[in-house]
Amino acid sequence: MTERSIFDAAGGAAGMTRIADAWHQRVRADPVVSHAFHKGTKPDHIDRLAAYLGEALGGPPRFTQQYGEHADVVRIHSGNGEHDEMNERAVDCFRGALRDAGITDPDTYQAVLDYWTWATWHPMYQFHGSPDDAPAELPMPHWNWDSTVSH
């Protein structure tokens, strides 16, 4: 029997969209994290984030089929210098977004939060010196219930 994915436990594509929308609303209102969005976002930012999050949590490969590669996302988040406070606040916003999106099962909540925290502090922050430091190809990480990544 196949174990249920985190993606499915969090509500599938609709759940990912609720999470992405709630996070987007929270970070746009946060006085520190909103700085990352001061130049605006793509009109489909919420859908892109939902697709990316879904793929990383065991859903279909919608992000890589429609929008780009993991390396593209890492480069977008690279070269911004050290910003520990922004990362901490972004994770706090995500905690609230999970609640706003109705993720009430404790195991699902924790699994999604653990992924987001790992992604915030590792691949999205790893190349804070320059986006040119990010490799051209990086496999999409796939998070599981054991809080480990496979590619």
What are these regions (language model features)?
Residues 125-151:
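Acidic/histidine-enriched, glycine/proline-rich intrinsically disordered or flexible terminal extensions
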Residues 6-9, 103, 136-139:
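Surface/interface-facing alpha-helical segments and adjacent flexible terminal/loop regions used
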Residues 2-6, 17-106, 110-113, 118-119, ...:
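Heme-based O2/NO sensor domains and their adjacent alpha-helical segments
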